[in-house]
């Protein structure tokens, strides 16, 4: 089971890093596309939240 969790964490980590880069890129382009700040930030927030929840799940499984 932990192998499948580790695979999910890897996917979620990649998704979170992409969301982080999207937010970073948006910040560098400001004030262009300022209207997208909340949308892009929400995606990053959700991606990192999902990653942290899955890491906690793995930690409980291993303990």
Where are these regions (language model features)?
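Short intrinsically disordered terminal tails
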Residues: 1-3, 60-63
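Short, charge-rich amphipathic interface segments used for partner binding and complex assembly
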Residues: 25-62
């Amino acid at each position: 089971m932990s192998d499948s969790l580790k695979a999910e964490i890897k996917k979620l980590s990649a998704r979170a890093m992409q969301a982080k880069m999207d937010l970073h890129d948006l910040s560098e382009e400001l004030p262009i596309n300022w209207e997208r700040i909340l949308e892009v930030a929400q995606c990053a927030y959700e991606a990192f939240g999902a990653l942290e929840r899955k890491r906690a799940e793995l930690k409980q499984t291993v303990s």
